Amino acid sequence: MPKRVLQGVVVSDKTDKTVVVRVERRFTHPLLKKTVRRSKKYHAHDEANAWKVGDTVWIEEHRPISKLKNWIVIQGEKRAEV
């Protein structure tokens, strides 16, 4: 069975070897017929502490690493410096 891969934005990197990633999904509301945005936060393993707040990353489902971490960061893009 293939592992799920999600794309999101890092919203916290304060924990050692862990990032919190916000994944957004969009759907059409069945009654209102308008696009609705919903997001969910996932704790993901970041072995090298490479990703910072604002970076776009892809996370992959993984075996449980801790109580909250079931995802690992597989790749990403650094946020552009201004």
Curated annotation (Swiss-Prot):
For this protein, the record's InterPro entries field holds: NA-bd_OB-fold, Ribosomal_uS17, Ribosomal_uS17_bact/chlr, Ribosomal_uS17_CS
One Gene Ontology cellular component annotation held by this UniProt entry: cytosolic small ribosomal subunit
Superkingdom field: Bacteria
Disulfide bonds, which pairs? none
| The protein's name in its UniProt record | Small ribosomal subunit protein uS17
- GO BP annotations listed: translation
What keywords does the record list, in alphabetical order? Answer: Ribonucleoprotein, Ribosomal protein, RNA-binding, rRNA-binding
Describe its partners and assembly state.
Answer: Part of the 30S ribosomal subunit.
Q: Which SUPFAM superfamilies match?
A: Nucleic acid-binding proteins
A Pfam family of the record is Ribosomal_S17
Q: RNA-binding: present as a keyword of the record? A: yes
Q: Indicate the family of this protein.
A: Belongs to the universal ribosomal protein uS17 family.
Q: Which GO terms describe its molecular function?
A: rRNA binding; structural constituent of ribosome
Tell me what organism the protein belongs to: Xanthobacter autotrophicus (strain ATCC BAA-1158 / Py2)
Functional summary from the UniProt entry: One of the primary rRNA binding proteins, it binds specifically to the 5'-end of 16S ribosomal RNA.
